[in-house]
Amino acid sequence: MTGENFVLPRRLDWRNLNTLWGSLLAETLSRLGCRLAVVSPGSRSAPLTYALAQHPNIEAIPVLDERSAAFFALGLAQQTRQPIPLVCTSGSAGAHFFPALIEAAESGWPLLVLTADRPPELRHCRAGQAIDQVKLYGHYPNWQAELALPSADPEALAYLRQTLVHAWERTLYPFPGPVHLNVPFRDPLAPIADGSTAPLLHLQEDPEFEKTFFRGVAPPCTGSSLQAVRSPFQTETVSFWQEWRGCERGVILAGPAQPADPQRYVEAVAHLATALGWPVLAEGLSPLRNYASLNPYLITTYDLILQRDRPQLWPEQVIQLGSLPTSKALRQTLAKVAPRVWRLDPRPDNGDPLHNPTTHLPFAVEEWVAGIPEAPAKRTTFLQGWLTAEAQIRAALDQAMTDLSEWFEGKVAWWLAHHLPPETPLFIANSTPVRDVEWFWPPNDRRIRPYFNRGTNGIDGILSTALGVAHGSHKRPTVLLTGDLAFLHDSSGLRLGQQVRGSLTILLINNQGGGIFELLPIAEVGRQGPDPPFEPYFATPQLVDLALLCQAHGIPHRRVESWQELAQALDPLPAQGVRVLEILTDRKADAQRRRDWFQQWSELPSKP
């Protein structure tokens, strides 16, 4: 759709310069493809808020808490894969966007942050609600600028339009991420006529002005159309392929991934694996585990396999897709063995925290496999060793989960993979849930779509991000798997529960504190001495009645007592609304159970 045939009624608001500026911004964003925006309340941002709220093609969602608003926008960006404008007033409001903006930068999601500001003459003079907002977010944005003050100049209108076009494009290219525009306004902030646009009366009276003015504004080229022209399999890369084909002790590492087309991604990895005859060690946050039948060399229990030294399974070469998997045992093995690493990742970041001998190949795996041979490689002893170990440990793990009747945090992840409806969007919180998914999530063919915040790996903003995913995928019910601390840390997100268009079921594992610390050395050391610090400073149990907290926000809450009751609660998932299903677990007992099982399973033989 082009600017010429994008026919709309007149959109510009000429009552004053600020309304003109705001309406021009909203109309430009609309023509670029914007359909959702997130707005936190405030006076200085009124011209932006009013314009976005009034635009018929943009759903402007009001969110009181700026931190929650920013993570909600991040969830919308993850689900829609489109830039989401995020608006706040001047002062400290924009600082609350920072955690989500960092996550967007680190994980590669497009946000267009619009911080309203006082004009320059009211800064650095204690005018109130004013801080230095220029380059507020340091080096994290893909691009950042301060807009000029609104002025009655035709060239200024063109400047604003093109700056917005550039800002929108920079949220997407060359790699998705946040962009920050600082937007100053003088009074009047309300949409009242003051005659300030009189010098532009000739434009206002021209019936063709808007059509002519916006004729070049249209959604930018999609990422897929840009990638289609890239052909990595050239002469200089054929040598890489020949080196891989000559190696019988290679592995493919598939880290966390949220590809636009999961099946295409999985098929590309399977093509690469079968052509090389290499096992694929797939992170629980990778779509590979949810399309298991497409990849015959899939390994899901590698963390348990590598908890014991098995030199016969150590790789000489590694193809790493994106970031490393979460597994600590895998990272320790790679650090010890120091294999030759080839990292396939279109992003330019340094993705090798182990500092192994690594070559960065700046391509997506879907691009790379387009030119490789179709003929599968033979099965090697090395590959068979991995497949045998996987089969043995997976069988023991699955049997243990099947036989277990009481609550266990790890079984929740395993159970969801067997019971969630196909293609369910599942947001997985950081800390213990993401590790239980890594350890226990089985291979399946349910095409479940994992969502997560693994850019900075924090527990902040989990609920709000999941609500954003649910709002963006409103035609398909969404599930959030979270612990009690992550839930409480972002409890202000509960206020969004009445606004979400769609469905979110929050599966809340309440183990009265930070269960992840029970698995770390601090759990043993921190319980020693006359005044042990572990419980108050690390486990940090919270005495909050979660049912009453949900009730205060109008969110239905239910404590689930059995696996059968959980199955009934999830079949079917509701089509609308937010609800909490709480499961009470014992973090100390569950931590010990993990340790016992991990020791038992990791000692299983793995000889081919």
Curated annotation (Swiss-Prot):
Record SUPFAM superfamilies: Thiamin diphosphate-binding fold (THDP-binding)
Gene name of the encoded protein: menD
GO BP: any one term: menaquinone biosynthetic process
Catalytic activity: isochorismate + 2-oxoglutarate + H(+) = 5-enolpyruvoyl-6-hydroxy-2-succinyl-cyclohex-3-ene-1-carboxylate + CO2
Keyword Coiled coil applies: no
Name of one Pfam family that matches: TPP_enzyme_C
Family the UniProt entry places it in: Belongs to the TPP enzyme family. MenD subfamily.
UniProt KW keywords: Magnesium, Manganese, Metal-binding, Thiamine pyrophosphate, Transferase
Descriptive protein name: 2-succinyl-5-enolpyruvyl-6-hydroxy-3-cyclohexene-1-carboxylate synthase
Cofactor names: Mg(2+); Mn(2+); thiamine diphosphate
Cofactor note: Binds 1 thiamine pyrophosphate per subunit.
InterPro entries xrefs: MenaQ_synth_MenD (IPR004433), MenD_middle (IPR032264), THDP-binding (IPR029061), Thiamin_PyroP_enz_TPP-bd_dom (IPR012001), TPP_enzyme_TPP-bd (IPR011766)
Top-level enzyme category: transferase
Quaternary structure (record): Homodimer.
E.C. designation(s): 2.2.1.9
This protein's pathway: Quinol/quinone metabolism; 1,4-dihydroxy-2-naphthoate biosynthesis; 1,4-dihydroxy-2-naphthoate from chorismate: step 2/7; Cofactor biosynthesis; phylloquinone biosynthesis
Molecular function GO terms recorded: 2-succinyl-5-enolpyruvyl-6-hydroxy-3-cyclohexene-1-carboxylic-acid synthase activity; magnesium ion binding; manganese ion binding; thiamine pyrophosphate binding
Function: Catalyzes the thiamine diphosphate-dependent decarboxylation of 2-oxoglutarate and the subsequent addition of the resulting succinic semialdehyde-thiamine pyrophosphate anion to isochorismate to yield 2-succinyl-5-enolpyruvyl-6-hydroxy-3-cyclohexene-1-carboxylate (SEPHCHC).
